[in-house]
Amino acid sequence: MATIQVKGQPVSTVRVEGNSRPLNGKSDVPLLLSFPHSGEHYPDDFDTNSELPFEILDFPNDKYVDELYQARSGLDLLSIHANFPRTYIDVNRHQHNIDVNMMKNGEEWYGRIHPSGVKTGTTLFWSKTKEVFDIYSRKLNHIELKQRLAQCFVPYHQLMTYYIEQIYQNHGKAYVLDCHSMTQFDGKLRGRKQRPEIDIGDRHGQSCTPEYTECVADVFSSFGYDVKINGRFLGGEIILRYGWPEINQNILQVEIRRDLY
């Protein structure tokens, strides 16, 4: 398993919790939970701007979201967790979503470059937090960024692929909840509009069947929450990569507003 150094000690970049029986072909429930942004282990080589307060750097992370789904253990569900913060590398971005301006000789990056989110600093390797605060005071080099891809991005998606395939082979179908949090209001660039309490993204029906979307939305609505489907967040790289309702492989991105907890 790939590791990062945290306070001089090796820490696995990704962990799997819950029922491991898919390894033996005996999974009971065709559901997997994904927590790509709840990591709290800051790598020693995360050389951030010394003037940036930690609470600002940590702000984009989906803190405590994995704790909201604690009932998963009683249901014996599998879950996959990134142990690193999303500002270090964001596994919910495409690997070619690169801002060349934050790198030395960025035009020489090894892969294709298809940036989105440059203005807000929210590409694969974040350059800003809260839209205005610079994460780095220097240009990054290719070696350190490619290392992050190899140690963090690749293992996360390898495990996602493996367990989804195991579930699918066992049941002929697979369901995934990609679990996130969001602030109460949009950022300044979007006019600070209030967001719904629960925002469920399915890329307008491209990542899962309507029945799955409606089922999850109805559960939240039954508890009195204001629920929107594709209201503010349609879903990122994870549901784009793994959502194939045409073969009954279904995934939703669920955003829970932070002020609720």
Give the predicted meaning of each segment.
Residues A2-V176, S181-L260:
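N-terminal catalytic or cofactor-binding beta/alpha core of small enzyme domains
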